[in-house]
Amino acid sequence: MYKRQDRARELTKAFISKDFNHFVRRNYPENLYVVTMTGYEEGIDAHVIFPPTKVKTPIAEYISDLGFKQMHISETEKQMHVTYFFNGGVEKPHVGEDFFIIPSQKVESYASVPQMSSPIIRDEVVRRVKAYDVYNYKFILINFANPDMLGHTGNYDATVRGNEI
């Protein structure tokens, strides 16, 4: 069963959305009863088995309420994980919360660049920690994309190389 909402929503929209126009749907069944594991987003007219649980106070909000500065860093492949998902479904940063997103490389397969943007992320985190008097981060959230993205390639050697930053 697939429970991640970040990719399943596109497929669900292709089946449900009346104004879907990203590709031509042939033999489109008009009378579908669509059930999803989770609620993907407002406006998708599907039945939901497990409605979203509202996170009352995400960690980032709690840290912000304490008056602490924080940084969430990743590359674009995992941007939603250090912003939207970590913040309980909210993309807007809290006071004192900095999002630092590095563009992922445009390649056919990440096996060809197993380090992805990890060295840049590593170096930026080290730079900001060393400059604590400038940034004053009390919390840093880092998501290295390459273990996950390389795991999907099935290329074991590239996955190992990508994790040796």
Regions found by a protein language model. Name each.
Residues 15, 22-27, 120-136:
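Short amphipathic alpha-helices and their capping/turn segments at secondary-structure boundaries
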Residues 1-5:
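Conserved small/polar residues in nucleotide/adenosyl-binding loops
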Residues 19-32, 161-165:
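Gly/Ser/Thr-rich active-site loops/lids in small-molecule metabolic enzymes
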Residues 8-12, 20, 44-45, 93-95:
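Short helix/loop capping segments that flank catalytic or ligand/cofactor-binding pockets
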Residues 139-143:
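Structural motif
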